[in-house]
């Protein structure tokens, strides 16, 4: 059983430099089971660079990473996957010409004893996971290029969850989606929370953060401005943190 008093993830005093410039400067953030933490800041604030230490895309030059209380080393995306960390990029990394099941198992196909693709098993497993995440999803027999933005997000999320993700990194999951599709993704995120996953949400839209997240961590110029529970702050407070680099709750 998951211990909710121990963070799923703790990034402690993480620092990364590029060409002598501190992209991330001693930043600490954490994430608990069943929680969504939004990461905000202008382009170049350091939020994506910070989270790429967790996904294995970058290596921190200083700091520590703890997963469920245990110190770990993440040198590459394979190390991240070994820690049940999955990333859903804005591009979704889906193969447009393949259907949902083929995308879900892309690179991790189920093979029969005879050495052939077990397409019926893969479709059955896809239907099972989609029934859990998005019961309204019915388009199993068409290429994902024919799906709406929200349906494509469903496939990308299902792929991560099927392969036992405990920690999900989502890069602007509602970008370029209409209101109805955005609501679909919001419902998916709520379902993932119920199942105990922890989600880091990289976002530019403050309204989405206030709606989808439990806490918001704001960065500016590579430093952490602050982390606040969204129910304790206003959108203007968050905007002030992004623009001014100061937390209105810090007096003096």
Give the location of each predicted region.
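Glycine-rich phosphate-binding loops of nucleotide-dependent enzymes
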Residues: 2-252
